[in-house]
Amino acid sequence: MRNFLTIWFRELSACFLSPVAYVLMVVFLAVTSATFLLDITQDAALDQPLTVTLFESILVWLTILVTVVCMRLFAEEKRSGTLETLMTVPVTEAQIVLGKYAGALSFLLLVTFPVAITLLLVVAVSPVLQLGDLDGGALLSGGLILILVSSLLVAVGLLVSLLTRNQIIAAICCFCAVWGVLLF
C-alpha cells in the first residue's frame, strides 16, 4: 500500500510542479464556461434542460483534457528509460499502474474542480437571469456521472499510453480511443 501511495503522490506532484497544471485549469474553466454561456444564449439550448447543456459542454472539452493528462503517463517513462528503473524497485506492476491511474485521475478531478464552483454560481444566479429551475438531483447525478466518465476515460488513456512510446502518438491514439468509447 505504501508503494501505491508513493507512486500516486509522485505522479500528482509531478503534474503540479510545472505551470502546465495551472494553465490547464484556467483554460479548461474558461473554455467550458464560454461554451456553456454561448449555448444558453442561443435559442436552441432553451429546448433542453439547463443541466443537459452544462454537462454536454463539459464532456466535449473533457476529452481533450484527458488526452493531455494521459499522454505522458507511461509513454514518457518509456521514452526516458525510467520505466525499467521503476520496475527494478520492489513494487508490483499493479501498484505502478494503479498509482499512475490514481495520480492522473486525482489531477484530472482537481483541474475540473473549478467547474463545480461554476455550477454553484449558475445555481445562485439562475433565478435572477430567469434560466429556469435547476434540479438539484440532476446536478448531483450529473456531477457523479462526470466523475465516473472521467474515471473511464483516464483508464482508456492509461491503456493507450502503455501501448505507445511517443507522447504525440499517445495523444492522438488516446483522443481517438476516448471518442470511440464515448460514441459507442
Model-derived features: where do they sit?
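Hydrophobic alpha-helical membrane-insertion segments
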Residues: 19, 96, 102-112, 173-184
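Residue-level signal for the membrane-embedded core of alpha-helical transmembrane segments
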Residues: 27, 58-66, 109, 113, ...
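Transmembrane helix segments
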Residues: 27, 38, 164-184
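Secretory targeting signals
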Residues: 35-37, 44, 48-52, 56, ...
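Helix-loop-helix units of permease transmembrane domains in multi-pass membrane transporters
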Residues: 73-105
